């Protein structure tokens, strides 16, 4: 029983009017038994496992305070970016373990993980974080070294004679 559609209004009224995945009901938070949201963030070679829960804004990285682990203010600002974008500064405690890569990659992985964990804890924050580009994994990684070259793109020094 195929229904003929003559206008866009008929298309809206059809049986499949609402696209899949776009339901009007709010999403439910993904929490563990202890009431924490868990997410994994990645950047370059670094991987961050992040747990967030409501608290006073304390961030623990590998058992150390944020200011001790990330001494550079730029990295600390980068890590706190998801909270400032959604106006949740000092409302969540973060406990995370970071491994691999350098400090900059680890800070990027931590920012990615915090953003994902925030969306799991409060799904309503997803559009703001997505618009800021914090939920997208940065695909840039180190280019591999090629044979016949000194590095990925640099050639060996040329000697005319």
UniProtKB/Swiss-Prot annotation:
Residues 1-38 are annotated as: Disordered. Residues 27-38 have a biased composition (Basic and acidic residues). Signal peptide: none annotated. One of its GO terms (cellular component) is cytosolic small ribosomal subunit. Gene3D superfamilies: 3.30.230.10. GO terms for biological process: translation. It comes from the Bacteria. Pfam families: Ribosomal_S9 (PF00380). Keywords: Ribonucleoprotein, Ribosomal protein. SUPFAM superfamilies: Ribosomal protein S5 domain 2-like. GO terms for molecular function: RNA binding; structural constituent of ribosome. InterPro entries: Ribosomal_Su5_D2-typ_SF (IPR020568), Ribosomal_uS9 (IPR000754), Ribosomal_uS9_bac/plastid (IPR023035), Ribosomal_uS9_CS (IPR020574), Ribsml_uS5_D2-typ_fold_subgr (IPR014721). NCBIfam families: PRK00132.1. Belongs to the universal ribosomal protein uS9 family. This is Small ribosomal subunit protein uS9. It comes from Rhodospirillum centenum (strain ATCC 51521 / SW). The gene is rpsI.
